[in-house]
Amino acid sequence: MLRDIIRNLSNGFVRFKGQTIGVVDERGEIAAIYKGIPQNDIGIRTDVIDNVPKSEAMRILVRSMAPQIIACDEIGSKEDIEAINYVMCSGVKGIFTAHGNDIEDVCKNPWMAQLINNHIFERIIQLNSKQKGDSKCIIA
């Protein structure tokens, strides 16, 4: 799902101009870079940093690529949260994923709880892995 969001925001669609996206792909699960070329379709305005720790990659993207949006999968460490604060304070929007059974489960991680309680996010969407298409907007 994250890859589809990235591709659509990057390419644009009817009445929505594509945005420059910076993808943090620490383990190569989003873009699947091979010899410098994404093997997955992630859009025409997308730059990728792979095989670099997420926190470092986010800072590099902000400083050197000037993306409008940064996308990163599986956040949760203290370093990730500090980097997200840096990204958001730099005026860059973000799309981030975190794994958990529900929002309460995600908030058991003290760093994630801090990020959520500081109202860094404009919107949090909870997906239900047991029932396809079932989602709930927590913050809007």
Regions found by a protein language model. Name each.
Residues 66-67, 71-125, 129:
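Conserved P-loop NTPase nucleotide-binding/switch module
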Residues 10-61:
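P-loop NTPase switch/communication element
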Residues 6, 58-59, 81-84:
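Generic hydrophobic/aromatic pocket-lining and core-packing "Φ" positions
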Residues 132:
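Long C-terminal interaction/binding lobes of large macromolecular proteins
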Residues 140:
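N-terminal cationic and glycine-rich segments that engage phosphates or anionic surfaces
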Residues 2, 21-26, 71-72:
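Short, conserved beta-strand edge motifs with alternating hydrophobic and charged residues
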Residues 2, 31, 78-80:
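Short glycine/serine/threonine-rich phosphate/pyrophosphate-binding segments
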Residues 1-11:
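Glycine-rich phosphate-binding P-loop
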